[in-house]
Curated annotation (Swiss-Prot):
One function term, GO molecular function aspect: acetolactate decarboxylase activity
Statement: the UniProt record of this protein carries the keyword Lyase: yes
Keywords assigned: Acetoin biosynthesis, Decarboxylase, Lyase
Pathway this chain belongs to: Polyol metabolism; (R,R)-butane-2,3-diol biosynthesis; (R,R)-butane-2,3-diol from pyruvate: step 2/3
Identification of the protein by name: Alpha-acetolactate decarboxylase
Coiled-coil region: none
Reaction equations catalysed: (2S)-2-acetolactate + H(+) = (R)-acetoin + CO2
GO biological process assignments: acetoin biosynthetic process
Length: 260
């Protein structure tokens, strides 16, 4: 009996240790709410809150209900990048129709002491993680020679398709600014579910401005990144999503036009 009790105590202790380790070191999983193709077709309202997102990760990007600006999240802080170029901390009760989150656990680090282009940074990542069949999360902290961004203006019903909305997109250029870049590289076979290729958002170091990145050049800074093998998607059940055309014939071209 004594030996059995001791074995049980050891097993319970081991289980508790493993639970504690898992809590501190969660799996690298991409959590996503809704689909990019739904956003593209005008599904701009969701029930997922910022608080919900932070239960699934400390790092990510997306947008807000009514397409009211871009979202950037890092170090468990979430910001709303608005159509006037300003930024503000998001409220826990705000909701999103589309967002992507993960627990950021980079496996690689690269320091840049001389100017590099967006493409050169992507080349570094692609050389380290050559398979296009894996997800990748990336972050840059540094001085940006320039960051060319856009944001999306808030919409009201009846909602237009995103390709029409972005005819009116405001664009901004941040020159010689310290800031943070948050991004994902998504496999090409995921186009429509997510945004294939690189998708990156930017916020200034004073947390006062930023947006969806169209282009940038890094003066100096630190790139951290890592691969991700798991994906979890929460699909909406509302009528707007259920009736949306999620696979139009021009899906790939439409996503590339709104993202680039």
């Amino acid at each position: 009996m004594m030996m059995h009790s001791s074995a049980c105590d050891c097993e319970a202790s081991l289980c508790e240790t493993l639970r504690g380790f898992s809590a501190k070191h969660p799996d690298s999983v991409i959590y996503q709410t809704s689909l990019m193709s739904a956003l593209l077709s005008g599904v701009y309202e969701g029930d997922t809150t910022i608080a919900d997102l932070l239960a699934h990760g400390d790092f990510g990007l997306g947008t807000f209900n009514e397409l009211d600006g871009e979202m950037i999240a890092f170090s468990s802080q979430v910001y709303q990048l608005r159509a006037d170029g300003s930024a503000r901390a998001a409220k826990p009760e705000q909701k999103t129709p589309f967002a992507v989150m993960t627990w950021f656990q980079p496996q690689y680090r690269k320091t840049f002491d001389a100017p590099v282009s967006r493409q050169q940074i992507h080349d570094v990542i692609d050389q380290q993680i050559p398979s296009d069949n894996l997800f990748c999360a990336l972050r840059i902290d540094g001085n940006f020679r320039h960051a060319h961004t856009r944001t999306v203006p808030r919409q009201t019903p009846p909602y237009r398709a995103m390709t029409d909305v972005l005819d009116d997109q405001p664009v901004f250029r941040f020159n010689q600014r310290e800031g943070v870049l948050v991004g994902f590289r998504t496999p090409q076979h995921m186009q429509g579910i997510n945004v294939a290729g690189y998708h990156e958002h930017f916020i200034t170091d004073d947390r006062q401005g930023g947006g969806h990145l169209l282009d940038y050049q890094l003066e100096s800074g630190v790139l951290t990144f890592g691969e991700i093998h798991k994906l979890m998607i929460d699909l909406p059940a509302d009528s707007a999503f259920l009736q949306a055309n999620l696979h139009p014939s021009n899906l790939d071209a439409a996503i590339r036009s709104v993202e680039n």
